[in-house]
Regions:
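Terminal accessory/targeting
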Residues: 1-52, 58, 66-175
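Active-site histidine-anchored catalytic micro-motif
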Residues: 63
């Protein structure tokens, strides 16, 4: 839902300038070619593996587009082809915290958010942390907020709170 695809073969999931369709447009489209989406997913997966030397631990598309009715078949095929066990689904039984964003990323919000989910075995906290570089500044308006999220999550208060509650931080490969 942002930027250019790796492949230049997009006829149903790209715009006239060759960019991915914006989320608001993609969610309303009914003629998205699943094979086109799958080919792009494979290209992105192969690039990821080439860059990092391993496959990712999970699949989660920008703006959760991987779980749209128009794309979910391609997502399932990709997960099976690459033996990826965890695919982020909007209707998952894993508690999903999506409101840790922008002005809601200070420590008190972090604590309040975690308290709401203490009864759950697994909780996924969506965040947008990053180290800012020129490329990110050029393609996103959500920049310094990312730094703020990072500082909140690695700060001493958050670490102490996590330790106090005996919360185990894991990653998708352990799920």
């Amino acid at each position: 839902t942002a930027g250019r695809p790796l492949l230049d073969t997009h006829k149903t999931s790209g715009d006239e300038k060759g960019n991915f369709l914006k989320n608001a447009i993609l969610t309303k489209k009914t003629d998205v070619d699943v094979e086109e989406v799958y080919a792009e997913y494979v290209a992105q997966m192969e690039k990821y593996i080439k860059l990092f030397g391993h496959k990712p631990t999970h699949i989660d598309g920008h703006h959760h587009t991987h779980a749209l009715p128009q794309t979910i078949e391609a997502t399932r095929r990709l997960a099976k082809a690459y033996d990826i066990k965890y695919v982020r689904h909007v209707d998952s039984d894993v508690a999903f915290i999506s409101d840790f964003y922008g002005p809601l990323t200070d420590y008190s919000q972090f604590e309040t958010t975690l308290k709401r989910h203490l009864d759950r075995e697994y909780v996924e906290l969506m965040c947008h942390v990053a180290f800012i570089d020129v490329d990110l500044i050029q393609c996103s308006t959500y920049n310094f907020d990312r730094v703020h999220e990072l500082e909140t999550l690695i700060g001493s208060q958050a670490k102490a709170y996590i330790a106090e509650l005996k919360i185990e931080l894991t990653h998708f490969a352990s799920y």
